[in-house]
Amino acid sequence: MNELTIAMPKGRIFEEAYQMLLKAGFHLPEEVEMSRKLMIEIPEEKIRFILSKPMDVPVYVEHGVADIGIAGKDVLLEQQREVHELLDLNISNCYIASAGLPNTDMNEIAPRIATKYPNIAMKYYKGIGEQVEIIELNGSIELAPMIGLADRIVDIVSTGRTLKENGLVEYEFISTVSSRLIANPVSYRMKGERIIDLVRRLKKCVNEQKSNHI
């Protein structure tokens, strides 16, 4: 049985990806979208979904417990896992930027950057010749400049509303982010025909979506 195991994040990305799979011609029961199960079997399509936290998707794919997965580019840039990036799905679009209190310069001696993306932040500041101290946080990143913990934050920006509501402004654009289809290298060889067919069908949906926005 040539079953495909697909790892996907719970929440908004799953909802958008589910709709895209439907448009691509996959027959998925309606209850899949509303299910609270962490593992969902679709025998008719020979597909199994594993639903997890966004940061865990590339881990499952790299270790082969999932053949393919859908992960944000932010997660892929941060983790640098051994996976194949097959397709930009053009969903959950946002970007990574630095932000801080308005009209404030970074500390010249030891600027501190708060973020949940330590590798992305370090690579960015190293690339522009800034020596910084990275403070890793897991939530409420916007608090860091407000309470004097950091000069800047590096975080995902979608609409900019959260920054504005907390009195912060953007300083530097770092990278665009969208959801990507990734594959385990061994699965890509062993189940290449199925995976390539999936990519072809999803790519058609992505192109149609883009043409509708022109």
From Swiss-Prot:
ATP-binding in keyword set: yes
GO CC aspect terms: cytoplasm
PROSITE patterns: ATP_P_PHORIBOSYLTR (PS01316)
An example Gene Ontology biological process: L-histidine biosynthetic process
Domain of life: Bacteria
InterPro entries: ATP_PRibTrfase_cat, ATP_PRibTrfase_CS, ATP_PRibTrfase_HisG, ATP_PRibTrfase_HisG_short
Record flagged with keyword Cytoplasm: yes
Keywords: Amino-acid biosynthesis, ATP-binding, Cytoplasm, Glycosyltransferase, Histidine biosynthesis, Nucleotide-binding, Transferase
EC number: 2.4.2.17
A Pfam family of this chain: HisG
Pathway connected to this protein: Amino-acid biosynthesis; L-histidine biosynthesis; L-histidine from 5-phospho-alpha-D-ribose 1-diphosphate: step 1/9
GO MF annotations in UniProt: ATP binding; ATP phosphoribosyltransferase activity
Top-level class of the enzyme under EC nomenclature: transferase
Subcellular location: Cytoplasm
SUPFAM superfamilies registered for this protein in UniProt: Periplasmic binding protein-like II
Broad class of where this protein is predominantly found: cytoplasm
Record's catalysed reaction(s): 1-(5-phospho-beta-D-ribosyl)-ATP + diphosphate = 5-phospho-alpha-D-ribose 1-diphosphate + ATP
Family classification: Belongs to the ATP phosphoribosyltransferase family. Short subfamily.
Domains: entry comment: Lacks the C-terminal regulatory region which is replaced by HisZ.
Subunit structure: Heteromultimer composed of HisG and HisZ subunits.
Role this protein plays: Catalyzes the condensation of ATP and 5-phosphoribose 1-diphosphate to form N'-(5'-phosphoribosyl)-ATP (PR-ATP). Has a crucial role in the pathway because the rate of histidine biosynthesis seems to be controlled primarily by regulation of HisG enzymatic activity.
Protein name: ATP phosphoribosyltransferase
